[in-house]
């Protein structure tokens, strides 16, 4: 059985002091969670959040990383830095990174391979835009992104990768895919992983849904056979709301 994973991507929200307050409120609310719980604050909050969640069931994630260990890459953060402060997961290829910072499938793949080589678990985001959806290209776009992201990932490492299906048109818009629609796309992602790594490995890979996930719609998504959790945005900024999602 795949253990569900609920991750809260805070995006560019919460100063270090606000971050501490949020996780302190969250800890008692999720202590009995059956799902794996991950918080993903901005870089400047990571050290403080790591300190507060130490010894709890909450794991730490980062929102991005560069693929080199060190060097003249102004403004970037390396996997070595993340590992040292206690990061377990790293989000790679979020649609906002692809859109605003022009991340390509090739860059996403470099980051995935680098994360795995430094014992970080990638949460790889894939998803189609509204125009791509309307043109009937959902599967083409999402499965291509999946294949490109996983190039060179070993059979041994594939089960450490989490995929997050985030339809771009559903992020922060209040619109969301129906649980059935999301499940169909996620099933296709799993079938693609099976083509690359075999059915047994594909059955072990966790695939999340992301895109306007809230306390009142989480149970519908989690009832679907192939959805293994959620990558939560705005609702993860309020402890009570995120806890309701975690404890669906």
Curated annotation (Swiss-Prot):
GO cellular component: cytosol
Catalytic activities: D-glyceraldehyde 3-phosphate = dihydroxyacetone phosphate
Localization annotation: Cytoplasm
CDD domains per record: TIM
Enzyme class: isomerase
Annotated EC: 5.3.1.1
Gene Ontology molecular function: triose-phosphate isomerase activity
Transmembrane segments: none
Record GO biological process: gluconeogenesis; glyceraldehyde-3-phosphate biosynthetic process; glycerol catabolic process; glycolytic process
InterPro entries assigned to the protein according to its UniProt record, in alphabetical order: Aldolase_TIM, TIM_sf, TrioseP_Isoase_bac/euk, Triosephosphate_isomerase, Triosephosphate_isomerase_AS
HAMAP family xref list: TIM_B
Similarity annotation: Belongs to the triosephosphate isomerase family.
Name of the protein in its database record: Triosephosphate isomerase
Species per Swiss-Prot/TrEMBL record: Caldanaerobacter subterraneus subsp. tengcongensis (strain DSM 15242 / JCM 11007 / NBRC 100824 / MB4) (Thermoanaerobacter tengcongensis)
Gene behind this protein: tpiA
